[in-house]
């Protein structure tokens, strides 16, 4: 099995034209590499875009690249990050999902006891089971992890991947970004 993990891409972040070109070139090279290496799937755990609805030029570029991935038969599994999150599914990510270019793996159900149960998306080629939680700004997603029904996730057999967007306290370096991180025990 071979997969790519592309996180914090932040398409649309750059405002200066020369930097926009670099931003797009880097993403284009990553996509081309995924296609040429024939990865089984691509994981994007948040912040594909810098905002939930980027400029039209960014949307056009993204749709063209994801069309290439789709045409190559490579599924893309995504969760929102803290920058491209939309509580009402009002994001370019949702448009990409509606046309079938990507799949959001944030399938959650609220249980009677208040816990959150995640359902898995099964990759057709590999059988890998993927579930995830989107990232929210300033660590507000912590409450979801506190309510997460871990028992059902752990009871699921087979190879599983949990897709999330956020920092882990134990992995933070001295030169790392400041912000809200979660302890590894919450995952």
Locations of regions flagged by a protein language model:
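His/Asp/Glu-rich metal-coordinating catalytic cores
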Residues: 41, 54-67, 72, 77-187
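N-terminal active-site segment of His-dependent metallophosphoesterases
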Residues: 1-65, 71
């Amino acid at each position: 099995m071979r997969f790519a993990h592309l996180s914090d891409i932040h398409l649309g972040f750059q405002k200066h034209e020369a930097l926009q070109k670099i931003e797009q070139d880097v993403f284009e090279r990553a996509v081309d590499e995924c296609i040429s290496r024939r990865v089984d799937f691509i994981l994007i755990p948040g912040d594909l875009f810098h905002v939930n609805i980027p400029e039209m030029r960014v949307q056009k570029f993204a749709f063209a690249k994801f069309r290439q991935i789709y045409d190559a038969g490579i599924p893309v599994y995504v969760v929102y990050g803290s920058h491209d999150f939309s509580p009402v599914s009002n994001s370019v990510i949702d448009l990409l999902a509606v046309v079938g270019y990507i799949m959001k793996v944030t399938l959650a159900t609220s249980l009677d006891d208040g816990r959150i149960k995640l359902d898995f998306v099964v990759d057709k080629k590999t059988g890998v089971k993927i579930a995830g939680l989107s990232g929210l700004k300033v660590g507000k997603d912590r409450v979801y992890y506190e309510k997460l029904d871990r028992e059902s996730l752990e009871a699921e057999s087979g190879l599983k991947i949990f897709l999330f967007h956020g920092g882990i306290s134990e992995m933070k370096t001295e030169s790392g970004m400041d912000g809200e991180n979660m302890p590894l025990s919450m995952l």
